[in-house]
A protein has these predicted regions:
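A short His-aromatic
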Residues: 81, 147-151
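N-terminal auxiliary segments of SAM/dcSAM-dependent transferases
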Residues: 1-27
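Class I SAM-dependent methyltransferase SAM/SAH-binding core
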Residues: 60-129
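A short beta-strand submotif of the Rossmann-like class I SAM-dependent methyltransferase core
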Residues: 141-145
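A short glycine-rich, Lys/Arg-flanked "PGG" loop and its adjoining helix->strand segment in the class I
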Residues: 155-164
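Conserved alpha-helix/loop element of class I SAM-dependent methyltransferases that forms part
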Residues: 24-63, 77-81
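A short acidic, Gly/Pro-enriched loop at the edge of an enzyme's catalytic core
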Residues: 128-140, 152
């Protein structure tokens, strides 16, 4: 890893272990949809600055990819539109963030009768080499993650999003 990516990894590892509400520049508004309840811990671990996807883009059960899982909030929101096993893929390089999301999905299951953790397939990987087959995704998204990349790494990450 490059030095700046190692530093970022360390910051998000700590944020997974101890939620840091003020970590990001702002907080995203929570999607208000009938029957969707966002657990408090997911809100506290929402380290994005606004979704790159609008709910109207998620018609017809799209297969979705989300890179940089945070506390799992956007994965839960995307699952609302694709209630199928593995219908949403979440990729993160930080093991602790993946584990935090898994734990948060248990709370989401308790609060949302329609949600099952199996709707989300969490994978270890990074944005510049996604562990996802080419042309297998209908909607690929990220939330502020790409803001940290230097130009060459950003080009690789964008190319990967288009590949899948």
């Amino acid at each position: 890893m490059n030095n700046y990516l190692e530093t970022t990894h360390d910051v998000y590892k700590e944020a997974a272990l101890t939620p840091d509400i003020g970590l990001c520049c702002t907080t995203n508004p929570i999607w208000e949809l009938p029957g969707l309840k966002i657990p408090q811990i997911m809100q506290e671990m929402n380290y994005g600055c606004g979704s790159t996807v609008h709910a109207r883009d998620l018609a017809n059960n799209p297969k979705m990819l989300y890179v940089g899982v945070g506390g799992g909030m956007e994965l839960l929101q995307f699952s609302y539109f694709n209630r199928q096993k593995g219908g949403v893929i979440g990729v993160d390089v930080v093991d602790e963030m993946l584990q935090a999301s898994r734990e948060n999905f248990k709370e989401a299951e308790a609060q949302n009768d329609w949600f099952k953790s199996e709707f989300v397939d969490l994978k270890k990987g990074d944005a510049m080499n996604l562990p996802v087959e080419g042309n297998s995704i209908d909607v690929a998204a990220q939330n502020c993650l790409f803001n940290i990349f230097k130009a060459d790494d950003l080009k690789k990450a964008i190319a990967e999003m288009y590949r899948v």
